[in-house]
Every structure is written in C-alpha cells, then in structure tokens.
Amino acid sequence: MLMGKWKILAAGLALLLGASGTAVRAESVDYPQAMVKLICDLKAYSAEKKPGFGLIGNGGAGLFLEQDGNTGENVGRLLQAFDGTMTESVNYRWEVEQGRAVRTNEADTEYFHQALAPAVTAGLPVLSLDYVDAKDMAEDSYQKNQEKGYIPWASFRRELDALPQDKPFKRNDRDMAALSQVQNYMVLLNPSKFGSREAYLEALRGTDYDLLIVDLFYGPEPLTAGEVASLKQKAHGGRRLVYAYMSVGEAETYRYYWQREWQDNPPCWLAEANTDWQGSFKVKYWRPEWQQILYGSPEAYLDKIISSGFDGAFLDVVDAYYYFLSHEAGEQG
C-alpha cells in the first residue's frame, strides 16, 4: 500500500494478533501464481472492455524474481500483463526517524534494483517513489533513480494529499499516448484538504505532470467521465494519462462495497486487519467472492474506473502474496 506497505514488509509481516477479521490459515494456494493470475485476468478483462487500458502495479517487485516459489513463467506473464510498475522507498523510506526522512539501507536498495532489473530490461516503465523532506534529498533521489532508468518522483508529503510546490521533473508539453513516454508523474490519493470537488479538480488541471494517479472517488461519488476527461490535458499543453487507484490486496472500510456486518461476521475472503493502516484488511485475493468486487459487473471497482474514462488502473498491495507466504512459513516453523 502506498504510504506504509514497505514498512510492513521490512518488519517481516508478523502475525497481527487480536485484530478483527478471519485468522490466516494455510490453504492449498500458490500465492505468487494466484496474484499473477489475478493481474492477468484483470488485464484480459480490461482489454476487452476498453482496448488500450493500462495497469500499473505497486509493491510487486519481488514477483519479477524467481524466488519464494515464483517461477520464470510467472515473471514472463507479469511482464506482459503490466504496462508499468511502481516501487516505493527505493532510496528514501516512508518512515521517519526523529522527525526526519531517512535513507533506505543499502541492502534493501540493492534488493529493489535486482528485483526491478527484469522490468527495466524488458522495457517496462518503472516508477520510483521516494519520501523526502529536504531539497538535497530530492535532488539525490532524482539523480539515483534516473541513473537506473526509473521514472522518479520525490514526494515531500507522505500522506499524498497535496500538490508539490516544485515543477515536474523534466516538464514537457508533449502528448502522452503510452506509459513508455512518461517522464514524470504525481500521486494524489487524499483530496480532503481541498475545499470542494471543483477546487480539487481545478488544482489537478493546473499541473503539467505526464501522469496523474488519483482516487476514483471524491467524497462518496466517483469522478465522472467529463471530469476525468478534463484532467487529461496538461496546463501548458499536451495530452497526459490519468490512472485511478484500486487495491487488489486489501479491502477498505471506507469504500462503497464495504458492509457493516463484516466487522463482526467477516466473509470468507477477509483476513487480518492491517494495524498500520486504519480501516484496511488483508484479503484472500484468490477467492472469487473478492474478485467479483474487483471486476466483472457494473458495480465492480475496475468497471467503475473504466466507466469514468480513466486511461488505466493503479493496482496497489500487489505484495499481499508475500503476507500470506510469510504467515504460512511461520506456521510451518
């Protein structure tokens, strides 16, 4: 998950005791393969509904490596299904120490580089999001990410709730027809600081980013096709891409699909609460009941994104597979 998923992975994904949700028990599931299959199914479905619709995955860098039971076949399928991938905290972490941003340790940075190398080699656009709080950190982040062939963004706002004050990295007026052309991007997932829906949209329209990643909703209502279309033009000219957020590995209590009775009587696909992120629950993403919430009907999340005219979907919590792998290993240990 943006703003904290890396923290959970780094902590080893310890069992969250005493949390609401069904207990995690070992099932006969190939967790990496199940996640890759879900992503491939989402790709096939979206391509049929809207040719050219793109998918960016977040948190799934480990699936580009043959490890933890992941196969070369899975890697190849994932590279074909994704139009881009994002990794957070390659150089600067989301966590702070003594109120200051901190550099990612060298071992983790090197792991990210190794995991992302197959994507870079295959020509898959790699978005890197670092969290910083000083100009020299931002400059260092942009330099290091650019050297690796990543599309960089150094965010000063961990909450991803405001527009950056600086101009976009490598600002340009060119039309963006594909993610492979993107040179800069911005993520804004929490619009609560904007005074109104129109103020929020107007602020986004006034930017020059090649790619915007935003939430499908403002308040209880999704953005309309007209509103999304108005975001596709950069302030100083040129077509840009606009993607909508969708979590594939966690359910969120503030989403339209959430039912109150699930808190006391959780469905079979709901797993442990994410205590690092209030209102989020891990999901057994391979279960058809959860996948029906994601896609396949007019009320499904992906279908709403497509209906609103977005260019693609930003799939968060792809690393949910590792959560279940870790729990299974802990039970066997």
Residue ranges and their predicted role:
Residues 2-9:
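Bacterial N-terminal signal peptides that target proteins for export
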Residues 22-333:
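Glycan-processing catalytic domains of CAZymes
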Residues 11-19:
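Bacterial N-terminal signal peptides
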